[in-house]
């Protein structure tokens, strides 16, 4: 419908602090890289017919068969949701928080990270079109 639609999206000011992409793997559906003390935004889609796994410190996000599962740390409840695989997933990483936006803005989750997330390594498999933007 063309009516009003509520959606969760990162604030527009985020675009103003986004730098040039840091990491663009070539023809690869997997990558591993340190955050190197840099808050960042990950933007990617699920590779068709493949499971996705994103590991951020002790937090693991998986997607398979149009289902999104986030297994957080620190005693937080796990998150399970339908996933629209045609929409990109945006993950914003800061020192102590992980924010996940999916389904064209109809899904949002904020999770507390274990320790200083920016000292950790990100690992992702099963993604396509991965872009990593530093946030200044």
Located regions from the model:
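Beta-rich accessory regions
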Residues: 1-136
